[in-house]
Amino acid sequence: MCRTRELNGLRALMARINNWNLATQNNKVYVADNERHYLVSDLGAAFGKTEWPPSDVPRLPHATEGVLKDYEHSSLIRAVKGDSVTFEMHTTAPFFVRIFRGKYFNKYKQAQRVAQGIPVVDAQRIGALLARLTPQQIRDAFRAAGYQPAEVDGLAKVVEKRIAALIHLKE
């Protein structure tokens, strides 16, 4: 796989919003006129946490989606080593859940790799691009996605903090 700075930025973005549903059918790279276009078609499994135990979405054995309190308290960065960063991303349930849901486990076990070994410079670059968004634009995106008014400001604040964290990696 050719990992361009744009693809690495997309990987950092998916980690930043805790999008654990990184199945191939949800994320594509298209080439048109010798130019790559990156498409994410499903962000429903984002803005929660990607770790055990799930809080209030019992249908998911390992994560939550769209839960402000979980997103606020979730970790972003696992480690920065040398010139690369690994983001916190747990896409599989604990062993005692996996043994009963083998297909589910197999579907998501490789997705954790998306958040590993991203060049710091590429993560900082996507952070700088995202920093161009105004606070109003970020809040408008959450409103357009159907979040409740009480959640919009909280989610936006977490996003803004995570953008700043991307920009200031290794500082």
Language model region names:
Residues 22-29:
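Hydrophobic residue at the +6 position relative to the catalytic HRD Asp in the kinase catalytic loop
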Residues 21-22, 159:
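Generic structural signal marking isolated hydrophobic packing positions
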Residues 35-171:
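C-terminal catalytic region of ATP-dependent kinase domains
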